[in-house]
Amino acid sequence: MTSPCKHGDRPPGRHDLVFVSPAGWRAMLDARDDLAADSLLARWPKMRWPTIRRRALPHEATGVALGLPLPPSAGKKRVALLVEIDHVASVARPPSLQQARAYAPRNWWPTLDRLDGLALRHSVDARVYGSLAWQSLTGLDYVTGRSDLDVLFEFRSETDIDRFVADVAAIETSAPMRLDGELMSADGAAVNWREVHGGASELLVKSIERVVLLDRHQFISGATGS
């Protein structure tokens, strides 16, 4: 479903899927006594399911910070992991809308199709994260009747951001779920699409390294201040 690349091709970034080697999994789980008895987590290396890149905590000075959200049946527990870079087998982007479509509730399909068409018209690469992404990656039940659709909109320099978010808002009016998600620039910095649509002059910009407030026009022009 995803298209992994070797970790040396580029460092794992925000929302990236990170596939860990068997040795890496052993090292991670051996370091965590609290995870030893988790039978669901033990399936991850056996099934070769990915983890997701997350922002490192202040005390995590070395290694690659990873996350793993368990499904509602396991209490939606979020597992924080840390692995040495040499144990990163490959990295992939999140699933595309079309890749995830078959795993979504049928009443979500028209919304996914409309968003996919919208992304194509606006030169945007649209991908899913959150519950639908994990359901498509693992086959486990993550999506519930209260789930949002989380979409990552990776825009380009030619994208008309204001028009695009207005069109996303229009699609949401007839969607059976809440549309959540982020607009991501080429350097990996991202903002919530609703903040942009709401006309905020300053935006909360998230990257893999930090969270900062940035002038709206700076973010849209690609000047993230990094």
UniProtKB/Swiss-Prot annotation:
GO MF annotation list: nucleotidyltransferase activity
Domain of life: Bacteria
InterPro entries to which the protein is assigned, alphabetical: Holo-ACP_synthase, MdcG_C, MdcG_N
Keywords in alphabetical order: Nucleotidyltransferase, Transferase
List of catalytic residues: 148, 150
Biological role: Transfers 2'-(5-triphosphoribosyl)-3'-dephosphocoenzyme-A to the apo-[acyl-carrier-protein] of the malonate decarboxylase to yield holo-[acyl-carrier-protein].
Entry-linked HAMAP family: Malonate_MdcG (MF_00650)
EC number: 2.7.7.66
Protein's name in the database: Phosphoribosyl-dephospho-CoA transferase
Protein family (similarity comment): Belongs to the MdcG family.
Catalyzed reactions per annotation: apo-[malonate decarboxylase ACP] + 2'-(5''-triphospho-alpha-D-ribosyl)-3'-dephospho-CoA = holo-[malonate decarboxylase ACP] + diphosphate
Originating species: Bradyrhizobium diazoefficiens (strain JCM 10833 / BCRC 13528 / IAM 13628 / NBRC 14792 / USDA 110)
